[in-house]
Regions:
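Extracytoplasmic low-complexity, Pro/Thr/Ser/Ala/Gly-rich segments
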Residues: 56-139
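N-terminal segment of the mature soluble domain
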Residues: 118-230
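Short secondary-structure boundary motifs at beta->alpha junctions and helix caps
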Residues: 267-319
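Surface-exposed short loop/turn segments
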Residues: 204-266
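Short, Lys/Arg-rich cytosolic juxtamembrane segment immediately N-terminal
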Residues: 19-30
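Hydrophobic membrane-insertion alpha-helices, especially the h-region
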Residues: 31-49
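Transmembrane signal-anchor/signal-peptide helices with a preference for the extracytoplasmic
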Residues: 43-61
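N-terminal intrinsically disordered, acidic low-complexity segments at the extreme N-terminus
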Residues: 1-19
């Protein structure tokens, strides 16, 4: 009987199958239905993207608004100071103008005051951008530690590990790092952030800056009294043929070389000190066991040379001896 019904079916087989599907409650996708489903899917994705972009843009504008509030508060004090410091560095990197010791420097009041410190090679001081790049990686060295006598406030408070590192002077790189969220570069990166993850990273950077770094920047602009600058002149002895790499600040500090030492009063803008001196010292091992590690020996040699440079500066700024009775004719 089924075979007879099958033989009697007329029309296209596809139409017959469609009739059977409808009668049994089943349905088949048509081209129109597939296109409609695809269109709905694309529309949903577009709607999700639009909503996400609107939310991201709202978060971006909120972050930039908070950044502008900090910039309005701190920027008018930090940016002029930054520009002045960079101008002093670039001017000092030109032809050396000869030694100069202001009477105020001889009083050595700066040694116990809060201030800023930067040391770099003369050859690297090309423009403001190069100063910022070098300062970001610069570290304090034994020269500042041997020359300055900043009171250890953390030690006086009894803070743990207060003696590990002197608080003063601030490294100029600390000031740059503390004020990074104020820069046009940072704002540009926030504006260019094209996904939620990158925007969250910038939001965390802002939160960290406000919590930990902006207080340092406020301290710098409010308390810093002087800017101590050391510019090291290159010498061929600092280049090790075996290394084959570029000359570095650490390599220079291992060998005797001329160093330009400048001191600026940040309250008046006056240059108090300008010296060209060479730090040269010899490390003499003591004890039964000599230091075998090359890295440790190099660190000791740099420390000795830098403290020797500080002694040369000490000698230059020491008050002249009082005239004797024979000199005055009495």
């Amino acid at each position: 009987m089924a075979e007879l019904r099958k033989k009697r079916e007329r029309g296209l087989p596809a139409i017959a199958r469609a009739r059977q599907d409808r009668s049994s409650g089943r349905s088949r996708w048509t081209t129109q239905a597939g296109l409609l489903a695809a269109a709905l899917l694309v529309a949903g994705l577009i709607a999700h993207k639009v909503v996400s972009e609107r939310g991201r843009e709202g978060d971006r504008q909120a972050l930039l608004a908070k950044q502008r509030a900090v910039a309005v508060t701190l920027g008018p004090e930090w940016f002029p100071l930054r520009d002045k410091l960079e101008g002093d560095v670039l001017a000092a990197a030109k032809d050396f103008a000869g030694d100069h010791v202001d009477p105020q420097a001889r009083r050595a009041e700066f040694r116990t005051q809060p201030g800023l410190y930067l040391r770099m090679r003369v050859a690297e001081a090309k423009d403001a951008a190069s100063v910022r790049t070098v300062a970001a990686d610069a570290r304090k060295d034994a020269f500042a530690a041997c020359l300055l006598r900043e009171p250890n406030e953390r030690g006086a408070r009894g803070d743990a590990d207060a003696g590990a590192f002197a608080e003063q002077p601030w490294n100029l790189g600390q000031a740059y790092a503390a004020t990074r969220i104020l820069t046009d570069d940072w704002v540009g990166e926030v504006k260019a952030a094209d996904d939620d993850l990158r925007l969250r990273i910038f939001s965390r950077q802002y939160d960290k800056a406000v919590r930990d770094e902006i207080p340092v920047a406020i301290d710098v602009v409010k308390r810093a009294q002087f800017f101590l600058l050391v510019l090291d002149e290159d010498v061929p002895e600092a280049v090790k043929p075996a290394d084959g790499g570029p000359l570095t600040e650490e390599a220079l500090q291992l060998v005797p070389h001329p160093s330009r030492v400048h001191l600026f009063d940040l309250t008046t803008g006056k240059e108090l000190l300008r010296l060209l001196r060479t730090g040269d010292a010899r490390v003499i091992p003591a004890g039964e066991r000599a230091v075998a590690d090359e890295e440790t020996r190099d660190a000791m040699q740099r420390q000795a040379n830098n403290c020797a440079l500080a002694r040369r500066v000490d000698e230059a700024i020491a008050p002249p001896p009082a005239p004797t009775a024979a000199a005055t004719g009495n």
